[in-house]
């Protein structure tokens, strides 16, 4: 059975698009007999589909900072050893920033979803942080508007957009 791992900061926002999309995909994957796994810092939606075959692992990735960066990376490496995903889907900048190098080091196919027009692309440091969402083997843009935004600020990744 193939294992698909989705990663996002939290499952707190009941009406959040990232959260809702993650859970909808997780449920669909489980229904299609994939091993569907989510990593987040938890939240009221974390156990929503547990009974439908979706598993959730908690790592505190909703708080930015150097201490949390190293703590979450250590836990993530252990979970990767345990889960052995066939595909990783990262849905937010901070988890992408923290985990991309480990995903790529293990040569796990890697997808990101670019959910918004992250501000600050005029600032070199902020643009570098925003660019972590283009590190996937493929980049899912949630709309034509977001697709155009990515092409404008990161034209070198246009062939990775789906």
Stretches with model-predicted labels:
Residues 44-45, 94-95, 145-147:
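Alpha-helix capping/helix-boundary segments
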